Design a protein with these regions (language model features):
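Catalytic machinery of carbohydrate-active enzymes
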Residues: 2-372
Length: 372
């Protein structure tokens, strides 16, 4: 019923007739890119923006994302405008869709893999609408062209780039991009100075641990993060930072209370791009699969990524040097928020020794990065 309300209220019947006559790629001038997912997902889609900007240098590129993920795109030279889809009453959602329709988009690239975004794309009235439909759902009927990935298990960066092939464009391997501003860099440097992490003689080695995640099954046990922090601090005489967003601050503080090395809790302290500027200055990032891991990899920081229910071949770090810890059990890649087996085996089987060994190898060949 909800979709039928949108269809009747925005004149989609006319769009359906017009889209059926669309045969080929236009010289696009006003493109809407849709990614209604999480921070890491939006970050991994940035190579598509680069590809579109290269192919259509004079086009206006607008990206639609969920509220809370827009910081990923701040200062990005490949996008002209970022719009946020707000959660709220249905009439407000309808007005938002009508606003999109008035924008006069001639192309939509939907990177979401979702029914809602497909309906939004159709509602814009754009004659060219590219999207994915790997599940062979009804939404495939709403696109003018369905993008087809080269292989089922390819990395999400490469998967998203297949949308450009659907536009008839050549695709090249892409790397995600973030753009901290000079102000972001200065904010981090001022904090480091105040925290005693900058010294004229020798700045300490910085290691950032990320003990939180979006759902519980992706979380390596807190006590193991605490043990890892102490062992790294003892072995490398480094300063440990505990990251996360504001919602994960309590998790970081719980880990800190279990340690001897007095780590600095930075969870919730910085904006997304300030966090990027901070992790860029760290010698190592160790954390669960999630947005922070992708930010660290994008900034070129060496990463040890701990994977459980998600598949590193699709979602692994892309950017700097990385080591993935993953057990690959028979229930692997369940993508479930809680363990269907009831024992969290995929994370419980990852020992502190294993992560410490991987982290040590990274630190032994990585110089300190406290200077920008």
């Amino acid at each position: 019923m909800r979709f039928s309300v949108v269809l009747n209220s925005t004149g989609i019947g006319i769009v359906l007739q017009r889209a059926a006559k669309s045969d080929g790629v236009m010289d696009l001038q006003n493109i809407l890119i849709i990614k209604l997912r999480h921070i890491g997902d939006v970050l991994l889609s940035t190579p598509v923006l680069r590809g579109l900007r290269t192919a259509f240098p004079r086009a206006r590129l607008t990206m639609l994302v969920n509220r809370g993920t827009e910081g990923v795109l701040a200062n990005n030279p490949d996008v002209n405008e970022v719009l946020c889809l707000e959660k709220g009453a249905w009439d407000a959602q309808l007005k938002f869709v009508q606003m999109l329709r008035r924008r006069g988009f001639d192309g939509v690239v939907d990177l979401t893999d979702g029914d809602r975004s497909a309906v939004i794309g159709l509602a814009t009235g754009a004659p060219v609408r590219i999207g994915f439909n790997a599940e062979h759902r009804w939404r495939g009927l709403l696109y003018s062209t369905v993008a087809k990935p080269r292989q089922a298990d390819q990395h999400r960066v490469d998967y998203d780039l297949c949308a450009l092939r659907a536009l008839g464009l050549d695709t090249k391997p892409g790397t995600p991009a973030l753009y901290p501003s000079p102000t972001d860099e200065q904010t981090v440097e001022a904090w480091m100075q105040e925290a005693g992490l900058l010294s004229a003689q020798a700045s300490p080695l910085l290691v950032l641990l990320q003990p939180g995640a979006r759902y519980s099954l992706k979380v390596w046990p807190h006590e193991r993060f605490a043990q890892l922090a102490d062992r790294l601090a003892d072995r490398f005489v480094c300063r440990i930072l505990l990251g996360g967003d504001q919602r994960e601050r309590e998790v970081a503080e719980q880990v800190a209370r279990k340690t001897r090395c007095a780590p600095i809790v930075v969870a919730g302290k910085f904006s997304l791009l300030q966090f990027a500027a901070l992790v860029k200055r760290c010698a190592l990032f160790v954390g669960n699969d999630g947005g922070a891991m992708h930010i660290a990899a994008t900034m070129g920081t060496p990463v040890v990524a701990i994977f459980g229910p998600t598949y590193p071949q699709r979602w692994g770090p892309r950017g700097g040097p990385a080591q993935v810890i993953y057990k690959g059990l028979d229930c692997r890649a369940c993508y479930h928020p809680t363990c269907l087996r009831g024992d969290d085996s995929c994370m419980q089987q990852i020992a502190v020794d294993e992560v410490f060994t991987a982290a040590s190898r990274m630190l032994e060949r990585t110089p300190a990065r406290t200077e920008t």
